[in-house]
Every structure is written in C-alpha cells, then in structure tokens.
C-alpha cells in the first residue's frame, strides 16, 4: 500500500478545527460588514506577469509557478537549458502562478474595474495564499490571509475605523488583553531628522525595529556601524525610551519636532485619529504609540498598525497601514490612496487555542442525536429529525440499526449535547426520552416540548 502524506508546509483541518476557524472567520466577516466592507474573491492563480516584480527578488523566488498544460517543453530555448539560464526557462514553461498575497490581486482588480467601482471602495477578502518558503514552526506554504482595505480616500476616519474594527472583532472573539501599536511614517522621518540623517532613514528604521529583540546597546552599536554619529544617539534614545500615554508621547514629540514639517504632519495625523475615536464615542484604550514600529516602509506612507495579544506566545496577529500607490505597480500614472489591514487567521487560531478562548459550543455540529431501538423506531426517527431541523435545531439520526451503547458512544465522541431515545413504547405514548449528555439528566417529553426546551 502506498504511504500517503501531506505536501510539506500544508495542513489538514478536521471538523473540530474547522468549527473553531469558522468561528474566527465568521466573527471577523460580520465586523467587516457592519462597517460597510464588501466581499471580494480573486482567482487562486494569476498570470506570472501580474505577480513578478511586485515582491522584490526574494519574493519572486517564493512564487509557486504552474507548468503550462500540454507539451510545456515545446517553446523552450535549448540554449537557455545548456547555459543554465533557469529564469528564462521558467518563463518558457510557466505563464501562471499561485497568488502570493491578496494585495497584488486586489490592485489588479481595482485597475481592471476602476470605471465600474464606486469609490471610496471598501473591500474585504479572506482566501488562501501560497509561498514556496522553507516550512518551519508557524510558517506554512499554504495559509489564509484576511484583508480589509478602503481605497480612493485620504480621510483619517478610515484609520479610526480600523482601530474600532480590531477592537470589535477582539471583543466578539473574547480577546480582552491586547495592544494595538500605532506609528506614522512621518514620525519615523522626524526621528531621522533628530540625527540629521534623512538620507539614512531606512538604515535607522531597520535598526530601531530590532530594539525589543536585541536591546538598546546592540542597536546603538549597529547604528554606529551604519555611520550614525554616536554623539547624537542619546537624543534619539531619550525619545524612544519616553514612557506615558499615547497622548503624552505625542505632546512630548511635538517639542522635539519643531523643525521637522514631516514629523509634525505625522503627529497631527495621529492626534486626529485619536480625536476621531472620541467622536465615535470610543477611547484610546489598548492603543499605544510605539516609535520602534517600522513595518512595510517600502509602501506605507502614513499611519502604521500592528496588533499583539499580550499573553500569547505568537507574534503579531494583525497589521497594516496607509499607502498612496496601491495601483502604481500596474499603472505609474494611477495612484490610489488608501488604508488597509490584515488579520492573521492562523496566528489568531493558535493564540486563542493557547489561551483557551474558544467557546465550547464551537466544537459540536449537531445539538441532538436521535437514538433508535428497532426498525420501526428508525423510520419514525426520520420524520422526528426533520421536524426538529425545520425548527432551526441541528439534528442527526444514527444511520445504522445497532446497539444503543454504540449510538450513545457516537454522541459522546462528537460532543453532541442531547440525545433523544425513540423506541416502540415512546412511539405509543408520544413521549420521548431526552438525555442531557453532560449531566446524564433525563426527562420524558413530546417532540414539540423537546424543541421548545432546546431552543
């Protein structure tokens, strides 16, 4: 017999896992929809010309390519094979690839449909993506992304709504101890201005992003190695080490950025987002200005977000930011400003599992199992089951005529909370035994009474 196995970097999700994943996805979907976001789906495969060149050289190497159908070697230039020019060979044998993320397909969709789309366009998208990465703990070749974006507006109300959506989703998922870290591209540029090193912004951001991983001393050493003036570093770390509320940090930075227009613009944007939260009737609870947050600097141009669940061992479970050039990758003349963020479904799942946050009711699929004692009661069970289902209660009938013990074990293993026992005596009296599996408590009821008691 051939040994069967999964492809490396992929996973199966059994019924119990799928119930939990569906709980997360359905909860997030409802939150997106409450804020006016509409669903979008794009194909699993895209033309390689759409995907290549959008993720840098390293990203291009992680694209899963799809062999052309039929005689895929027909158009291959043999000279390229002889010379080991595999990039050219790949172009000859593969014209399509699996999507690497949801952002590039979204940008392609916006460009192709810009005359039909109503802007500002609010979309959410929950689909799997594929990366030819080296599999390791927490890193898979197939995983789900869960994105929400608003494109076609500069309004900072969108940033405030992102914070509200994260709060609403976490509240509904039962996640209460978390931090929404925020920063701004302009604030980061203002920090570079403190060191008179605007031309070395990227080097500065890469270094300070490591602060919580390698510590202050190592970051200082790295900055000096990168050519920063050691005498100016105390001023930088005075700012980075300042503690207090988000509002206090903004006030403190205002005095430091008196000569930085871009820094002041960043602070004003953050201040406006906080004010908009108040206008929504919310607070800045869980929101923290983190000056070391420097994600996505190649494309984020305004506010930046990252979310961590404080007692979980997983890393960030959500992140995003403001961008000004979503569609520029396809049309340099077309620049669509927008803001978006993403939930990591797999990391959210791992964190909720670790912290035992899943409600018990997410596990079972059926509320009732009907157990039958003979052929007559089996046939009666079918009608009873349909009556129960038509009243909105998930119900199943054990499909085989077998011992009651085996039927009860089935209910126990599937975590079905109630069992209804039907035999010839029950059919005569129209009273059926309803057993609560958790406690063993039993009562004699009509089908109508059973429906009423469980609803």
Please annotate each region the language model reported.
Residues 20-35, 46-47, 81-93, 101-176, ...:
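Positively charged, Gly/Ser-enriched RNA/tRNA-binding surfaces
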Residues 38-44:
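A short beta-strand-loop structural module common to alpha/beta enzyme folds
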Residues 44-96:
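Polyanion/phosphate-binding surface patch
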Residues 61-73, 197-218, 309-310:
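Acidic, His- and aromatic-enriched active-site or binding-groove loops in soluble protein domains
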């Amino acid at each position: 017999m051939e040994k069967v196995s999964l492809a490396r970097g992929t996973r199966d999700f059994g019924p119990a896992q799928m119930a939990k994943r569906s709980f997360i996805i359905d909860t997030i979907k409802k939150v997106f929809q409450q804020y006016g976001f509409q669903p979008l789906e794009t194909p699993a495969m895209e033309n390689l010309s759409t995907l290549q060149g959008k993720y840098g050289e390293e990203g291009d190497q992680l694209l899963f390519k799809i062999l052309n159908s039929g005689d895929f070697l027909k158009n291959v230039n043999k000279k390229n094979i002889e010379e080991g020019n595999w990039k050219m060979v790949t172009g000859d044998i593969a014209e399509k690839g699996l999507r690497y993320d949801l952002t590039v397909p979204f940008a392609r969709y916006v460009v192709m449909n810009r005359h039909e789309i109503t802007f500002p366009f609010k979309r959410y998208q929950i689909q799997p993506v594929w990366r030819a990465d080296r599999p390791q703990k927490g890193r898979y070749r197939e995983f789900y992304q869960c994105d929400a974006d608003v494109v076609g507006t500069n309004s900072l109300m969108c940033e405030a709504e992102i914070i509200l959506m994260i709060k609403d989703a976490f509240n509904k998922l039962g996640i209460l101890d978390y931090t929404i870290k925020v920063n701004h591209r302009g604030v980061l540029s203002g920090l570079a201005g403190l060191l008179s090193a605007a031309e070395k912004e990227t080097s500065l951001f890469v270094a300070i992003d490591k602060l919580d991983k390698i510590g202050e001393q190592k970051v200082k050493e790295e900055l000096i190695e990168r050519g920063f003036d050691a005498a100016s570093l105390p001023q930088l770390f005075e700012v980075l080490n300042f503690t207090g509320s988000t509002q206090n940090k903004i006030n403190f930075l205002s005095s430091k950025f008196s000569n930085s227009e871009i820094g002041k613009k960043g602070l004003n944007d953050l201040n406006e987002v906080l004010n908009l939260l108040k206008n929504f009737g919310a607070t800045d609870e869980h929101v923290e200005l983190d000056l070391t947050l420097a994600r996505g600097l190649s494309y984020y141009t305004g506010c930046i977000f990252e979310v961590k669940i404080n007692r979980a061992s997983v890393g960030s479970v959500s992140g995003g930011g403001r961008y000004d050039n979503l569609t520029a990758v396809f049309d340099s003349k077309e620049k669509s400003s927008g803001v978006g963020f993403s939930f990591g479904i797999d990391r959210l799942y791992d964190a909720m599992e670790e912290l035992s946050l899943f409600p018990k009711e997410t596990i079972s699929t059926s509320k009732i199992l009907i157990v039958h004692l003979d052929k007559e009661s089996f046939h009666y069970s079918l009608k009873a089951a349909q009556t129960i289902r038509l009243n909105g209660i998930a119900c199943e009938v054990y499909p085989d005529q077998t011992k009651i013990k085996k039927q009860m074990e089935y209910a126990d293993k599937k975590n079905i909370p109630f069992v209804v026992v039907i035999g010839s005596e029950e059919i005569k009296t129209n009273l059926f035994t309803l057993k609560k599996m958790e406690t063993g408590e039993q009562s004699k009821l009509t089908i109508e009474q059973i429906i009423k008691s469980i609803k």
